[in-house]
UniProtKB/Swiss-Prot annotation:
This protein's name: Co-chaperonin GroES
Gene name in the database record: groES
HAMAP family per UniProt: CH10
Domain of life of the native organism: Bacteria
Location(s) in or outside the cell: Cytoplasm
Assembly description: Heptamer of 7 subunits arranged in a ring. Interacts with the chaperonin GroEL.
The keyword Transcription is annotated on this UniProt entry: no
GO biological process, one term: chaperone cofactor-dependent protein refolding
InterPro entries referenced in this protein's UniProt entry, alphabetically: Chaperonin_GroES (IPR020818), Chaperonin_GroES_sf (IPR037124), Chaprnonin_Cpn10_CS (IPR018369), GroES-like_sf (IPR011032)
Record-linked CDD domains: cpn10 (cd00320)
Recorded coiled-coil stretches: none
Lineage per the UniProt record: Bacteria, Thermotogati, Deinococcota, Deinococci, Thermales
Cellular component GO terms, alphabetical: cytoplasm
Length: 101
């Protein structure tokens, strides 16, 4: 029996891979929302980070976020991908709006 190999995601340059954090599927009034009515969350956990942005002089600037950070990102930023049945978003650092602490 062959062992299952898990795919490793390694973003390039100033990109990060984020796994969305799903919010409670209820409104403040207690109404349960169906999946079709929910917006995708704009908050997630950083799974992997690239090596950083390269300046014109060749110097590499490391990213301000690290693996494990919880971030808020732009609503329409990034590229959604599915790997090993899990959904992720690949974002440029400029699409990250804040780190939650």
């Amino acid at each position: 029996m062959a062992a299952e190999v898990k795919t490793v995601i390694k973003p390039l340059g100033d990109r990060v891979v984020v796994k969305r954090i799903e919010e409670e599927p209820k409104t403040k009034g207690g109404i349960v929302l169906p999946d079709t009515a929910k917006e995708k969350p704009q908050k997630g956990k950083v799974i992997a980070v690239g090596t950083g942005r390269v300046l014109e002089n060749g110097q590499r600037v490391p990213l301000e976020v690290k693996e494990g950070d919880i971030v808020v990102f732009a609503k329409y930023g990034g590229t959604e991908i599915e790997i090993d049945g899990e959904e992720y978003v690949i974002l440029s650092e400029r699409d990250l709006l804040a780190v939650l602490q």
